Amino acid sequence: MSIQDCHVFCSLRSCIFRLTSLVLLAVPALAQTPSALLPNLRINPPRSNVPPPGEWRTTALVEESEGRVYRLHGKAQVEGAAVLFAADDIEFNEDTGDLRATGNVYFHDFGKNEQLWADRVEYNTESETGKFYKVHGETSPRIDARPGILTTNNPFYFEGDWAEREGEKYIVHNGFVTNCKIPSPWWTLRGPRFDIVPGEHAVAYRSIFRVKGLPLFFTPFFYKSLEKEPRKSGFLIPNIGHSSRRGIMFGAGYFWAINRSYDVTYQVQDFTARGLAHHADLRGKPRSGTDYDAILYGVHDRGIEQGKTLQKYGGLSLSAVGKSDLGDGWFARGTVNYISSFRFRQQWSESFNDAIGSEVQSVGFMNKNWSSYTFNVVAARLQNFQSSEIQVTDPITQQVKGLEANAVTIRKLPEVQLDGRERQIWKNVPLWFSFDSAAGLLYRQEPLFSGDTLIDTFQTGRLMDRIHLAPHLMSAFHFAGVNIVPRFGLDETYYSESQAPNPDASQALQLPVYRVIGTDLVRSAHDFSMDLIFPTLARVFDNKTIFGDKLKHVIEPRATYRNIAGIGDDFMRFVRFDDTDLLSNTDELELSLTNRLYAKRGDTVREIFSWQLWQTRYFDPTFGGALVQGQRNVLLTTAELTPYAFLVGPRNYSPLVSVLRMSPVGQWSAEWRADYDPLLGRMVDSTVSVDYRWSKYFISAGHNLVHTDPILTTPANQLRFRLGFGEPNHRGWNAGIDGVYDYHQQVLQYATTQVTYNTDCCGLSVQWRRFSFGTRNENQFRVAFAVSNIGTFGTLRKQDRLF
């Protein structure tokens, strides 16, 4: 039997499913921000004897017809190419389009894997209007597999007293939606009415969100955009939290979709014990290949009592990232970071690494690469805080003058760079030419404190010139199994200003201190180096072990001789901006030995162990007069060997640098970096990290030790640890702890403890955090509730979660 226009009924049924699932998506927030659209791949089980498209097959225990009116009784079914409609009784008038189904009505859309049940259906295929009574159904979920989103394979389920269609609008009355298992769902969103306009929006009115029957919150209006790129202005869900130093926190926000290319999110938080915090996020994508994101955060701090003094730590921070494809091979990218004070960062930062980070760096560049050349235009600002702001006292009146930043500030406004990679000069001659060049306008400022007294300020001109050119020639030879790579180069650098000793400040600080003088200075250096790459020694072990079917041990010896001359004791006259200014005389030989162990299992080969050793022999222990006795010396040659400074006087050899890495089994890895100084006869610094994960269990630990001359750096002895059980989508209990303990200060600087319980459709997380460093001593308590496939609301941010 051929029945036309049955697709109209399918449209109503499909929209009911969309209404329930899309209204459900409105739970996390009233405002809709742009999100990535992930395609849903559904593999439907094959069906046999499927009717061709446009044709319908009917079956029933009793079939009757009067003209174009069809009546089906007893196990009545109407099946099409993609859908199945079943009921106890079905009546369809092909002339008027009226369709009535009663008794155990069932509908299945095989294409979308959606199912619907109802007691009774009245529908007109001509006017595309109809009603469903005592309806419930389910549809496959849209799984949004983003970080921080709890997911589930449970279908979305809904119930309603009745549902209707009016033109393009679909309405479900007196119902609820959930994606939990029935009949005892963990959560429901229940309301008297749900509206949907396909392709535009879905709305829930006067709805109540319940968890295990307990009302969690009520809202008179929930909105969810149904557009492919949802953008709708609106208010964000309020949140609440608590901190031992900030008091109770109440937060609210608004999302403004300016147009399809720009949006702004504004959030305000009221800390009852401290003041108001403001957070503004501006995003833009004005054209293809160009986008940016800028976040401004500020706090108006009423202050906190410390002793008998009210201390205020208000301020602001700005962070922004952006990039743009300018076409024709040109590309621009930038990162902006700014804080008004280091005190503000320590007090109000929500990340431990951010709160203790002393560097604030901004850089923007425009780049083009072609052939073997690279061209950059760079603008940069680096602010390196030496400590929190210092309350300065007038040395004469002894009156407090205010807070001064104790930070080194370096700017490049701008610097133009042109580099050329190695390029063979003649085809049959092993000779390659390369060069580095740069010209920029630079600036450096550094305050000089003695206690709480500002002695002087080291400061260059606002636009100091520096021009740098370094051409190099390289060759390569092979002799008796040894690869020989000689290299010769020149280094010419012009400075429009230089530095000279500052006797007054040096006497006050009892340290060598410099001041800027307006004397032009040219640095002319020449360098020669030769790499000797010796043949590797290798042995294969065929015995099968727990690491693999075969093992291979490789030894890689190498030596590098380097000679740089022409700088001498002029080294101290150059103002420091970056590693270009750290070049000094040297006459040295670096020896290195690397052991590697490879394991082969089947066709897969991986490195399971490596141990690298370096040490440098200095034939010029004073580096041409650049070294200053009794103070910390940082030269380019020593900085390239190890990040830890070790020069406080002349010496003939460097510490022995060791890096050991192990990854013997899949889920276990370890690394140990250490410097052993034969001159002191001990390990001067050591960094160890170990990571292991088995099933749902994980553990990570690290130890950092600095035990060297106090002139070089402040001693350190810290333990980092993280351990726990669980993962973001693990059902049941999850728990973990993360912390940093300072043995030197005997204090737990940072700790996070999180407990999460996930059900089949939602999860509750509780987290306690402690900060104890610098000017901050604070405990925080945070809670978050997650709904699977939808999102999370609460005060626990996804970037602060352990899992």
Task: Describe each region flagged by the PLM.
Residues 6-8, 41, 532, 790:
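Short linear motifs in intrinsically disordered/low-complexity regions
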Residues 6-9, 24, 34, 280, ...:
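Compositionally biased, intrinsically disordered low-complexity segments enriched
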Residues 1-15:
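N-terminal secretory signal peptides that target proteins for export/translocation
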Residues 33-178:
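Charged (often Lys/Glu-rich) extended helix/loop segments that serve as interaction or gating elements
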Residues 11, 16-28:
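Bacterial N-terminal signal peptides
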